[in-house]
Design a protein with these regions (language model features):
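Gly/Pro-enriched, hydrophobic low-complexity segments
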Residues: 1, 5, 9-12, 18-22, ...
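N-terminal mature ectodomain segment of secretory-pathway/periplasmic proteins
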Residues: 1-57, 119, 131
Length: 172
C-alpha cells in the first residue's frame, strides 16, 4: 500500500494505491483511488487471472487475453510504481518486459554512488528505463531495489532524510 500526495499551489495528486505482485514482481491486482494533479477523481483497477487481464480507469475499460509476462501501467501512477517496474525489469529475461496497455520497456544500470543524509548513508544505483517516453526515465534504487529518488528538470523526489543528497543526485 502506498499513499502519495504533494501540493503545488493548490494542485497536486492525493492517491492511495495497493498492489499485489506475483513471484516475478508482475502486478496481479492494482487498486488506485484519490485525485490527480488537477483534482479530478481517480478510481483505477487492474486484475490479472490465469488467462486474462482486465482494467478500468478514466480512459479505458478493457479486457485482454494474457499472452505472456507483462507489466501493467496505471493511468495515474504513484512513484512506487516506477520502482515496481524497475524491479520487475531487473528480474526479467534480458531485462525487458511487454507493457500493458501497450509497449515494451527495458532497463540498464548507469551509475552507482554512496549518499549521506540525516537518515544515514546508503549505496544507491541509477537506472534508465527505456520505452515509457521518448527519453529514458531515470530512477534511483537502493541496494534492496527500493525507490530512493527520482529527478527531473522540474522536480525531485527523494527518500526522507536524504534531502542533502539532492545536489549529488542532480549532477549524475
Amino acid at each position: 500500500k502506498v499513499h502519495f500526495e504533494f501540493n503545488d499551489r493548490g494542485r497536486g495528486p492525493k492517491l492511495d494505491s495497493s498492489y499485489t505482485l506475483d513471484a516475478k514482481g508482475l502486478p496481479v491486482t492494482i487498486a488506485l483511488k484519490g485525485v490527480d494533479y488537477l483534482k479530478a477523481s481517480v478510481d483505477e483497477t487492474f486484475t490479472r487471472s490465469a488467462d486474462a487481464m482486465t482494467w478500468k480507469n478514466a480512459a479505458e475499460d478493457e479486457k485482454r487475453a494474457l499472452v505472456g509476462p507483462a507489466f501493467f501501467l496505471t493511468l495515474n501512477p504513484v512513484p512506487e510504481e516506477d520502482a515496481l517496474l524497475a524491479r520487475a525489469l531487473l528480474n526479467a529475461p534480458e531485462q525487458q518486459l511487454d507493457l500493458v496497455p501497450a509497449g515494451r520497456a527495458s532497463i540498464r544500470k548507469l551509475a552507482s554512488m554512496s549518499v549521506s543524509g540525516k537518515a544515514g548513508t546508503r549505496e544507491v544505483d541509477l537506472y534508465a528505463i527505456s520505452g515509457l517516453t521518448l527519453m529514458p526515465y531515470l530512477i534511483w534504487l537502493d541496494r534492496d531495489q527500493r525507490f530512493f529518488a527520482g529527478y527531473s528538470s522540474w522536480s525531485c523526489l527523494i527518500r526522507e532524510g536524504f534531502e542533502e543528497a539532492i545536489p549529488a543526485i542532480e549532477k549524475r
